[in-house]
């Protein structure tokens, strides 16, 4: 799992905090150019096994994934 964020991005901060709280191992790249290189314009960008989730969808996806993980699924 790789989190791409940019400085000053409130949604990026929220997602990073959720990922840290869940104790998930992930790579964090804080670089707006790296986000653009992915072909997306929104931050945060969360890359999971080739799928890219961006903006609020990244937070929603991670929240649901973390909940399933906590329930043993």
Label the predicted regions:
Residues 31:
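Active-site loop/turn elements of alpha/beta-hydrolase fold enzymes
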Residues 1-28:
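Local sequence-structure signature of Cys/Sec-based thiol-disulfide redox active-site neighborhoods
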